[in-house]
Design a protein with these regions (language model features):
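A broadly tuned "polar low-complexity/structure-edge" signature
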Residues: 2, 171, 189-191, 259-263, ...
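Hydrophobic alpha-helical membrane-embedded or membrane-associated segments
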Residues: 34, 38-42, 258, 281-289
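Alpha-helical transmembrane segments forming the membrane-embedded cores
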Residues: 261-304
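Solvent-exposed, non-transmembrane regions of membrane-associated and secreted proteins
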Residues: 16, 21-250, 296-304
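Selective detector of the "anchor" transmembrane alpha-helix that sits immediately C-terminal
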Residues: 247-268
Length: 304
């Protein structure tokens, strides 16, 4: 008698419940692909922030600083010497040949300060004063105010406006790391040294600069009396990454904000309509990404 094909046959041995061959490897590949995609998107976002979006951030800071400095100049309260708060506006910079106009110079040359504009190096006299004044600026990000500085020609005008008046400098030369330094200016003379970075090859090489550029300009006449100097910045070089506890603490908090924003977006995606989740969640996630990028950029060399 033949067996009924519709009846279930019971197997007395052990049942192999493992997934079919190859499924585990496929899941690993899918997970790895998602991780690589996420990393690529994060790197792409950070490059977009550095090369494009950071310019809007500096433009906003410059507008605020310009209004603050103009008010101080009108009231006669702009600084003429130490102490000067880090990040405070100290001068207006114009370089006609490079189309640099009314650029606000802030106090300090750390990465945090150079996000707002060119920075005056602590420990040197303020622009326009007797002695050597050093002003550093970025070449690639945050508006790249000194991107064309290596191409400046001898004799180009550099005009600086401070609480002590308007001062005109003439460029005398460009030098790089290892080149001989010019002799100190004589009594009653002033020099302005503009500093930025440059790379070799494509424009992307500026993200990893290899050389520091120094442009020396001599004051034509009428150096102002030098005010008190602040303590020199202990940071060894403007091309070195600087990690401080404050920036790390701020970055940790910003990452928590980003994780919270992502968690909220996922929750809204599963509970609300897709349109409502995008409208409510996308701006919050972008703002958190912007915050993380802005703080994270402070860990990079100050001149890029």
């Amino acid at each position: 008698m033949s067996a009924d094909p519709t009846r279930t046959r019971v197997h007395d041995g052990e049942v192999d419940a493992s997934p079919p061959p190859g499924r585990g490897e496929e899941q690993v590949r899918v997970a790895g692909g998602r991780v690589m995609l996420a990393l690529s998107l994060l790197i792409g976002w950070f490059l977009l922030y550095l090369l494009v979006l950071s310019s809007f951030e500096q433009n906003h800071a410059q507008n605020v600083l310009y209004g603050e400095l103009r008010t101080q100049l009108a009231e006669g309260t702009a600084p003429t010497g130490a102490p000067v708060r880090a990040g405070a506006p100290v001068a207006l910079l114009d370089i006609p040949s490079l189309d640099v106009e009314s650029l606000v110079v802030v106090e300090g040359t750390r990465s945090r300060q150079l996000q707002d504009g060119p920075g005056h190096r602590a420990g040197t006299v303020l622009p326009g004063q007797e002695g050597v004044s050093v002003v550093a600026g970025r070449s690639t990000s945050y508006g790249k105010p000194f991107a064309d500085l290596p191409d400046i020609v001898r004799g180009a005008r550099v005009v600086v406006t401070t609480a002590q008046g308007e001062f005109e400098y003439l460029v005398t030369g460009t030098r790089f790391d290892g080149d001989p330094m010019p002799a100190p200016p004589g009594e009653g003379a002033g020099r302005l040294t503009l500093v930025t970075s440059t790379g070799t090859g494509s424009w992307l090489s500026r993200l990893q600069p290899s050389r520091t550029v120094y442009v020396d300009a001599e004051l034509r006449s009428g150096a102002a009396a030098a005010g008190p100097r602040s303590a020199p910045d202990p940071e060894p070089t403007l091309l070195a990454s600087h990690v401080d506890r404050l920036s790390l603490a701020e970055l940790a908090l910003a990452l928590q904000v980003l994780l919270g924003a992502l968690a909220g977006f996922v929750w809204a995606w599963n509970r609300w309509s897709r349109k409502a989740a995008w409208i409510a969640g996308a701006p919050v996630v972008v703002a958190a990404l912007w915050l993380v990028s802005s703080i994270g950029a402070r860990l990079l060399p100050a001149l890029i």
